[in-house]
Amino acid sequence: MPEGAQGLSLSKPSPSLGCGRRGEVCDCGTVCETRTAPAAPTMASPRGSGSSTSLSTVGSEGDPAPGPTPACSASRPEPLPGPPIRLHLSPVGIPGSARPSRLERVAREIVETERAYVRDLRSIVEDYLGPLLDGGVLGLSVEQVGTLFANIEDIYEFSSELLEDLENSSSAGGIAECFVQRSEDFDIYTLYCMNYPSSLALLRELSLSPPAALWLQERQAQLRHSLPLQSFLLKPVQRILKYHLLLQELGKHWAEGPGTGGREMVEEAIVSMTAVAWYINDMKRKQEHAARLQEVQRRLGGWTGPELSAFGELVLEGAFRGGGGGGPRLRGGERLLFLFSRMLLVAKRRGLEYTYKGHIFCCNLSVSESPRDPLGFKVSDLTIPKHRHLLQAKNQEEKRLWIHCLQRLFFENHPASIPAKAKQVLLENSLHCAPKSKPVLEPLTPPLGSPRPRDARSFTPGRRNTAPSPGPSVIRRGRRQSEPVKDPYVMFPQNAKPGFKHAGSEGELYPPESQPPVSGSAPPEDLEDAGPPTLDPSGTSITEEILELLNQRGLRDPGPSTHDIPKFPGDSQVPGDSETLTFQALPSRDSSEEEEEEEEGLEMDERGPSPLHVLEGLESSIAAEMPSIPCLTKIPDVPNLPEIPSRCEIPEGSRLPSLSDISDVFEMPCLPAIPSVPNTPSLSSTPTLSCDSWLQGPLQEPAEAPATRRELFSGSNPGKLGEPPSGGKAGPEEDEEGVSFTDFQPQDVTQHQGFPDELAFRSCSEIRSAWQALEQGQLARPGFPEPLLILEDSDLGGDSGSGKAGAPSSERTASRVRELARLYSERIQQMQRAETRASANAPRRRPRVLAQPQPSPCLPQEQAEPGLLPAFGHVLVCELAFPLTCAQESVPLGPAVWVQAAIPLSKQGGSPDGQGLHVSNLPKQDLPGIHVSAATLLPEQGGSRHVQAPAATPLPKQEGPLHLQVPALTTFSDQGHPEIQVPATTPLPEHRSHMVIPAPSTAFCPEQGHCADIHVPTTPALPKEICSDFTVSVTTPVPKQEGHLDSESPTNIPLTKQGGSRDVQGPDPVCSQPIQPLSWHGSSLDPQGPGDTLPPLPCHLPDLQIPGTSPLPAHGSHLDHRIPANAPLSLSQELPDTQVPATTPLPLPQVLTDIWVQALPTSPKQGSLPDIQGPAAAPPLPEPSLTDTQVQKLTPSLEQKSLIDAHVPAATPLPERGGSLDIQGLSPTPVQTTMVLSKPGGSLASHVARLESSDLTPPHSPPPSSRQLLGPNAAALSRYLAASYISQSLARRQGPGGGAPAASRGSWSSAPTSRASSPPPQPQPPPPPARRLSYATTVNIHVGGGGRLRPAKAQVRLNHPALLASTQESMGLHRAQGAPDAPFHM
């Protein structure tokens, strides 16, 4: 493959692990000697054959060496380097220093082989695909080019990313984790592998065209590739089937490495990649068998029956010496047997055609062995005794495989409903189940069956076959054996295919083998003997290795069956030992399900092994590599190709052209079949070997981990695995049963998701829910850098409860592999239906694993402010002299359904975040402080308040001083705060001037006509609190000035003062105009007058900012500056900010008087940058300054208590410690929100994030001060805030990229609304924007009658270290103030 690297490889010749390990040496000359040679070296490390395989083109794995090879190749373009002998140079010396451990060498080989593979992919994309697309060199159409290269570009992109991750992994465990995290992304290979036969056919056609053949040859010479394009196109097929082998090799040597902790991850990676390979092989197998079936139909002469496809899948085919229906004597003639799910067809070869000689329906099939001929057996028709055929197999393996499959299919197709035990007895006695002698193997696997009875049923027809085998059943527990056998068979008839897979049931298959000493030979010995814990015959194929794994469960004979089983990954449940069984499983799937119930344990055992075996066998052309198991070797081929049966038969099956070619290609072992690929033969054998040796050892060990993985997937894939109802037992059971599994799974999950250990533990049900949500698109897949894991009691309970103890780890592993295979199958089907492209898998993959089943969408605000750990969207509650403050604050929440306890308000600096509810206006844009709909202000310490935009429920500031009245709101009284009630009908006639007065403990809210903010005296003690608040008053018809700015102007500009200076914005006359974002400069903000259509009304919103602790005068004291709408003012820190009243034909001039009080010099930045609210473009204050946002809303909407009023969706200034506050303008329309607080970056969310980050610094000190200020009500409020904090921290976690525009954020309403017990009517709640996963609303807040808020359970896990740190502090503070559970009163 080095050539793939082409010149590239030259750049990094030495890097290739293969070389480095094997001997960096691998002298250039040597490597060059054979371009392929280098590849081989890389591959060689784990398995020598693998390396040689690489040489054969098929051995994409050979690529690994490419790194070094390319250099050689560049220097020496030899077209066909010598044999892959060089591959085994690995012993040559190690590049540097001490000889690395085996584990390290294997890890390096994985990286190096991946590097070489990526170079080859790049060569395909850039050197072949590019010219063909750009120049139309060969005159190929776009469709032809697509057929030729399929989705090779997606694979190249994905592999490049995988390589980058692998190179950044410093340990073997990290490498395994890369595969676990990206396991789902590998499904893109399915499309490629399925298209490969078509690609190969087209390439062969082109090779017959002189111009095309000439161009390809010239191109190969120019690139100095030793292998033709055909070999390169085969590499992805080879590579995907080798990952699990490489990982198995990694697992084999894990003992040398660190402890067992990382082992679980390695095992999960093995299971995941085995499932991928298994699924791909199964799909290929089905495709090949379908092609083979058509070919047989075409060649068959004398057949007058229906199309052969009516008899199910082609399970096995083979050539035997045999006789006709006459007597027991063998006539020496050759008979071709084609075993379908429902019928055995006997034919004779006549040249290239087949002559029909008879058929026997599987329900009437009788099989008996000849005591005189160890290789002979007889098949007859129970209904027509004369219809019998004496056959002689070529070896014991083949005989065992056929007898097992025939018996299994007989029971699966039997019309009678045979009890499982009866079936087992029949199989053992009537059918002379040789497996009888091999029951011991089965006993090992019993647990497997029990864990996943349903799955077994659906997936284990093959398994059942296992059950039929007497031997295995005995070992399992006599009764289970028979039961599983019965059920599987009974069910099998219904689902022939499942049956086949299950037919792979090792138990049955092997038992027959076991009966005859011969069958016990190769595979039986390995499987049975090793069966108990680890069958690790190095000579075995992947399938055998899987069988070994299964052996742990006690399934030994399954080896052959397994091969068959692999044919149907879909039947993953059927880890049938042989492919034949796998195919058979289709008819018997149903019965297998029934049987599964009876014999869960048994089936599980059988099932687990078969699928793995099959998968591995398929992947590694087992035939060549399975010295120990001749039959198995053939079997692997069988699974891969319809020809596989022939293989079993021996030469004939493998010879079947169409299938064999395809299977060979896919299987590597068959590669030789491809003439154009020079090294194909060696390659094929190599892969097989690698698979065998690798799979056996590693797979067995990781069996548990794989099972765990499978559970995870099942959880992830509700559709398939998630359905564990069928496999439910198995999945949950596995978790419970295998402590190791649970451990593995949690660890896997954790690693997979990159969550902390605490997050690591996830029950299957949780995973299932998360996956379902992702699959359904409820949660955005693209994700969260660090998804938050929220475990729910129900999830945990379900998980543990569902689990059923008793299944051995190997069983669970097998089940997992099967489930994973199903998962991949479903996903592929979905992909194919929707699109044939899975390029976007990577991004969504992680999310899916990480995705929490979180009902609540991420809060836009929270997302926006992931960075601000301190400011979690909670207003710090500062009880100045007003005890009412806290209570009031909660009140708005109460009315506001939107309030999610997650209303994030910046707390630090004691400054609350002013929020504009954008319930109506914002379609879910995040509001820093108040949820739009919730119309909730979270009181913050420092007494600063958020303005409540929601009409129905303004949140009073915690500072007693601020009151926001929304006409829609009834009245929310804070302790010590006057309640202002605005008639629901009144369109907020009142100015709602909200003046924050630092006056001690005095606070009054003007009545409707006027809303005054009372400033709680700002004392140095409250550095955070900035007394001033903005309240947004809601105007009926016309949007009021947002903040102090223009009234009615859709665009309000929040002003923050830096250094205590504030810019006043004059509202522009244009009311329809959306709020324009204002840019703020340094300490001063340039006031922008929002254009108001209406002339500025008399209403003025004076902003008074007082730096330091100086209290503001009483309302009267407030400086009100009425400035023409157009006049922009910049104020010094010390200067009060006047807002230009926006004159507006509002029914009432609504004036928001904001007094900015820099609560304390403490606030880190009194001169915090003003936050500008713009349509969403305005940057929010970066500084921790208290920003209060006031949003005006239309009264009508607000009055309904629907928090959806004209709040500027974006309008949400985040208060920062600086004490400056932002005013947000609200949209003229209650629903419409034109103003968005955005960071300088632009979006409100960003602003919030920024504020939070700003707050982060100062927040710690403010909490203490605020704590001091808290009064009794404050404590309750603080409890509420604590809950809110948790939810917001979660949201923050969700949205680390707080910069996202608010609009894009999930709507507040989405999560909170559903939770509010009594959501106010929302006239026009904006549709929530696309949901994003959010952990923000983990805390549920219920609004009870009387405006009481009581947080529901909040089960959250914060995984961000930063979150944990800052969050813990703030949490501690809140908790000190009061329990979050305390009810809140409006």
Swiss-Prot record:
Positions with biased composition (Acidic residues): 592-603
Gene of this entry: PLEKHG2
Gene3D superfamilies in alphabetical order: Dbl homology (DH) domain, Pleckstrin-homology domain (PH domain)/Phosphotyrosine-binding domain (PTB)
Name of the protein in question: Pleckstrin homology domain-containing family G member 2
Record organism: Homo sapiens
Protein task: May be a transforming oncogene with exchange activity for CDC42. May be a guanine-nucleotide exchange factor (GEF) for RAC1 and CDC42. Activated by the binding to subunits beta and gamma of the heterotrimeric guanine nucleotide-binding protein (G protein). Involved in the regulation of actin polymerization.
Residues recorded as bearing Phosphothreonine in the entry: 445, 1257
Compositional bias annotation for Polar residues: 1048-1059, 1073-1086
Domain of life: Eukaryota
Disease: Leukodystrophy and acquired microcephaly with or without dystonia: An autosomal recessive neurologic disorder characterized by profound intellectual disability, dystonia, postnatal microcephaly, and white matter abnormalities consistent with leukodystrophy.
Phenotypic consequence of residue 204 to W: In LDAMD; results in impaired regulation of actin polymerization
Limits of the DH domain: 102-283
InterPro entries, per the entry: DBL_dom_sf, DH_dom, PH-like_dom_sf, PH_domain, PH_PLEKHG1_G2_G3, SOS1_NGEF_PH
Residues of the PH domain: 313-411
Biased amino acid composition, Pro residues: 1318-1330
